[in-house]
Amino acid sequence: EEVEGVLHGHPGVADVLVVGVPHERWGSAVTAVVAPTDPAAPPTLDELRAHARADLAGYKLPKGLVIVDEVRRSPAGKADYRWAADTAAAATS
């Protein structure tokens, strides 16, 4: 949630969930699943990392980025982390 809060502060991010994706070297790679404010010009991974660098420790910075049309949430607004993890894993495999 800390990483999500920082990434929400980027002007190009409308909504975001952050999940761990299995990675050979790191065990798990922090991956941001982002719905951009402007789908025609989504933020890049480098932009998000630069934005978050002042507020987060290096190991918390996203190592992956998946752009989606909409971040899936329940009718009550709860994050669907299973969907986000599946989406991120499918995009990085």
Language-model regions: role of each:
Residues 18, 66-67:
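Hydrophobic/anchoring residues in structured secondary elements
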Residues 62-64:
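Residue-level recognition of the N-termini of beta-strands and the immediately preceding loop/turn
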